[in-house]
UniProtKB/Swiss-Prot annotation:
<keyword id="KW-0132">Cell division</keyword>
<dbReference type="Pfam" id="PF03776">
    <property type="entry name" value="MinE"/>
</dbReference>
<comment type="function">
    <text>Prevents the cell division inhibition by proteins MinC and MinD at internal division sites while permitting inhibition at polar sites. This ensures cell division at the proper site by restricting the formation of a division septum at the midpoint of the long axis of the cell.</text>
</comment>
<dbReference type="InterPro" id="IPR036707">
    <property type="entry name" value="MinE_sf"/>
</dbReference>
<dbReference type="GO" id="GO:0032955">
    <property type="term" value="P:regulation of division septum assembly"/>
</dbReference>
<comment type="similarity">
    <text>Belongs to the MinE family.</text>
</comment>
<protein>
    <recommendedName>
        <fullName>Cell division topological specificity factor</fullName>
    </recommendedName>
</protein>
<keyword id="KW-0131">Cell cycle</keyword>
<dbReference type="InterPro" id="IPR005527">
    <property type="entry name" value="MinE"/>
</dbReference>
<dbReference type="GO" id="GO:0051301">
    <property type="term" value="P:cell division"/>
</dbReference>
């Protein structure tokens, strides 16, 4: 039956083939371009502000941007602060 379907099926037009290929390319680029160009500078600026108040290692700050449903972006900022020094009387 599959052999009969193969010979009787219509060939896809070149426009449809090109459209499918373009959709694959666009989907791949969206996955690979997940990080916006401004994110490293944003991380640096946030780190500078935090360092004005607390002495921390730059590796203790993580910034992630997550895309949800195409039009919603979530910026997640995690800062591991050092333990507070006990004040002596």
């Amino acid at each position: 039956m599959a052999l009969l379907d193969f010979f009787l099926s219509r060939k896809k037009s070149t426009a449809n083939i090109a459209k499918e290929r373009l959709q694959i390319i666009v989907a791949e680029r969206r996955r690979s371009d997940a990080e916006p160009h401004y994110l490293p500078q944003l991380r640096k600026d946030i780190l500078e502000v935090i360092c004005k108040y607390v002495q921390i290692d730059p590796e203790m700050v993580t910034v992630q941007l997550e895309q949800k449903d195409g039009d919603i972006s979530i910026l997640e900022l995690n800062v591991t602060l050092p333990e507070a020094e006990e004040s002596r009387p």
